[in-house]
From Swiss-Prot:
HAMAP family: Ribosome_mat_RimM
Record text about domains: The PRC barrel domain binds ribosomal protein uS19.
Self-association and partners: Binds ribosomal protein uS19.
Molecular function terms, GO-annotated: ribosome binding
Family that this chain belongs to: Belongs to the RimM family.
Record-linked Gene3D superfamilies: PRC-barrel domain (2.30.30.240), RimM (2.40.30.60)
Keyword annotations: Chaperone, Cytoplasm, Ribosome biogenesis, rRNA processing
Keyword Chaperone: yes
PANTHER family for the chain: RIBOSOME MATURATION FACTOR RIMM
Name by which UniProt lists this protein: Ribosome maturation factor RimM
SUPFAM superfamilies named in the record: PRC-barrel domain, Translation proteins
Keyword Cytoplasm: yes
Length: 176
């Protein structure tokens, strides 16, 4: 039986590339080998069971955050177009171990966001936006979404097992 929490999305198929069935992938993983090293992977249509595939080759497009992958059995542009929007997934237990202050994207989404010494609930983490400085998107309890720099000075404590993180925002940050 399919269990959603046993799989982790590492990318999304966003477009075909060329006429031979190659696929453009928008990654949501910081591990390039997931897109470049040949081997077993899975693709998944929303709310369906993942389907095992074989990645035959992959490369990063220079200057862009897009990978081009070749998958066994997808050899025409039309067959590539059929799976646009599908996710590239891996079993969650195949995640690499991280050092003390590193976190998997999947583990941060859904965490309670708490504030200050009282650790009062202020909202929930809804996204992590990658960039020069990563940003946590937090939906506040009143429904407004705010972006918080994901740095130790502002997010000093993260308790993955207890499903919360602490935010000490500078004055005015949550009012923007």
């Amino acid at each position: 039986m399919f269990e959603k929490d046993k799989w982790m999305t590492i990318g999304e198929i966003v477009a075909p590339q060329g006429l031979r069935g190659d696929l453009r992938i928008k990654p949501s993983s910081d591990f390039p080998e997931r897109f470049t090293k040949p081997g077993k992977r899975w693709i998944q249509k929303t709310d369906e069971l993942p389907t095992e595939i074989k990645l035959t080759k992959g490369k990063l497009i220079p200057g862009k955050s897009i990978y081009v992958l070749s998958i066994e059995g997808v050899s025409t542009r039309s067959s590539a177009e059929e799976i646009i929007g599908w996710k590239l997934v891996i079993p969650i237990d195949s995640r690499p171990m991280l050092s003390k202050d590193e976190y998997h994207y999947h583990d941060l989404i859904g965490l309670e966001a708490r504030r200050g010494p009282s650790k009062a609930l202020i909202g929930y983490v809804t996204d992590l936006i990658k960039g020069g400085n990563d940003l946590l998107e937090i939906e506040l309890v009143e429904g407004k979404k705010v972006l918080v720099p994901f740095v130790k000075e502002i997010v000093p404590e993260i308790e993955i097992k207890e499903k919360w993180l602490l935010i000490n925002p500078p004055p005015g940050l949550l009012e923007l």
